[in-house]
Curated annotation (Swiss-Prot):
Required for maturation of urease via the functional incorporation of the urease nickel metallocenter. Belongs to the UreF family. It comes from the Bacteria. The gene is ureF. Its main location: cytoplasm. It comes from Pseudomonas fluorescens (strain Pf0-1). This is Urease accessory protein UreF.
Length: 224
């Protein structure tokens, strides 16, 4: 079987986990005027990629994928606890939990997930997206690095979809932004791979504040 199919499946917006429902604070940034043009959108996404995802979210997800691939279940359990503790706002916690639950339901109904992974998932009190993404990669025989690349691409694609719904930003402009941001996506993956686990962490105050403000936003399209 062509291995690219599994990777495309994992990164597909058709994966039924509801990623299109969340903006991760971007809708609030548009509402308060911080993001109001392609240039400001590029700055917002670039900062999220290099200052937050590359330093924390991406290496944490990569560690989940590696532990699942190597069957290091105790390590994976510790990573799950770290992930849950790192959700700084109610919306970010619910986003990870709800998307994780949807992916868990999908995996439970598929034959590819092996018994050790099923057992781990069954005894996990609160499966989140990073865990279920790692188990999906294991089930579909996707390497940890490729699983990380798929996750980064899905994140970028979703952010651009949010912009097309909230800004005067058409599909061609979104594709131009994609071309400009792809080198940063590659840099984020490389940084996430090289980072020392002891230095894992970011201080994304702007993201946290945007997500907290989004909880009280009067009119909104997205759940975060």
């Amino acid at each position: 079987m062509n291995p690219a199919w599994a990777l495309l499946r994992l990164a597909s917006p058709q994966l039924p986990i509801g990623g299109y429902s969340y903006s991760q604070g971007l809708e609030m940034a548009v509402d308060n005027g911080r993001v109001d043009s392609p240039d400001s959108a590029r700055r917002w996404i670039s900062d999220q990629l290099l200052l937050n995802l590359a330093r924390f979210e991406a290496p944490l997800l990569l560690a989940h994928c590696q532990a699942a691939a190597d069957e290091h279940w105790d390590e994976l359990r510790k990573l799950c606890e770290s992930h849950r503790a790192s959700r700084e706002t109610r919306e970010l916690h619910l986003e990870s939990r709800q998307m994780g639950y949807s992916l868990q339901q999908l995996l439970n109904g598929l034959p590819e997930l092996d018994q050790p992974a099923r057992d781990f998932l069954e005894h996990c009190a609160e499966p989140h997206l990073a865990l279920c993404w790692a188990l999906a990669a294991r089930a579909w025989q996707i390497s940890p690095q490729d699983a990380l690349a798929a996750w980064l691409w899905s994140w970028l694609e979703n952010q651009l979809a949010v912009l097309m719904k909230t800004l005067p930003l058409g599909q061609q402009a979104a594709q131009r932004l994609t071309s400009e941001l792809l080198p940063l996506l590659q840099q984020a993956q490389q940084d996430a791979t090289r980072i020392n686990p002891e230095h894992l962490g970011s201080a994304a105050f702007g993201l946290s504040l945007a997500c907290m403000a989004h909880e009280r936003q009067y009119s909104r399209l997205f759940r975060s």
